[in-house]
Amino acid sequence: MRTFTLIAILTCAVLVIFHVSAAEELEAQDVIQPEDIFTGVATLEEDRIFECSFSCDIKKNGKPCKGAGEKKCSGGWRCKMNFCVKF
């Protein structure tokens, strides 16, 4: 499990570095404005939160991860990396 966590963290770090370098390159080419970078990141985070909330509505092993009308996962379920995980 620790290996999976380490791989996930390293993958995220590489993706962030790649995203920042690509954004800097586009900024240098005057394709995007510097303030647009942060707007895009905020939108991405909102999309991920939505995906995470949506995935918790999916039933795992016949049990709902999140009760109807609830905003958070319940019953020992947690939403991690767009998956319902039982803790």
From Swiss-Prot:
<protein>
    <recommendedName>
        <fullName>U3-theraphotoxin-Cg1b</fullName>
    </recommendedName>
</protein>
<dbReference type="Pfam" id="PF08089">
    <property type="entry name" value="Toxin_20"/>
</dbReference>
<comment type="similarity">
    <text>Belongs to the neurotoxin 12 (Hwtx-2) family. 03 (juruin) subfamily.</text>
</comment>
<keyword id="KW-0800">Toxin</keyword>
<keyword id="KW-0960">Knottin</keyword>
<dbReference type="GO" id="GO:0099106">
    <property type="term" value="F:ion channel regulator activity"/>
</dbReference>
<dbReference type="GO" id="GO:0005576">
    <property type="term" value="C:extracellular region"/>
</dbReference>
<feature type="disulfide bond">
    <location>
        <begin position="56"/>
        <end position="79"/>
    </location>
</feature>
<feature type="disulfide bond">
    <location>
        <begin position="52"/>
        <end position="65"/>
    </location>
</feature>
<keyword id="KW-0732">Signal</keyword>
<feature type="signal peptide">
    <location>
        <begin position="1"/>
        <end position="23"/>
    </location>
</feature>
<dbReference type="GO" id="GO:0090729">
    <property type="term" value="F:toxin activity"/>
</dbReference>
<comment type="function">
    <text>Probable ion channel inhibitor.</text>
</comment>
<feature type="propeptide">
    <location>
        <begin position="24"/>
        <end position="48"/>
    </location>
</feature>
<keyword id="KW-1015">Disulfide bond</keyword>
<feature type="disulfide bond">
    <location>
        <begin position="73"/>
        <end position="84"/>
    </location>
</feature>
<keyword id="KW-0872">Ion channel impairing toxin</keyword>
<keyword id="KW-0964">Secreted</keyword>
<dbReference type="InterPro" id="IPR012625">
    <property type="entry name" value="Hwtx-2-like"/>
</dbReference>
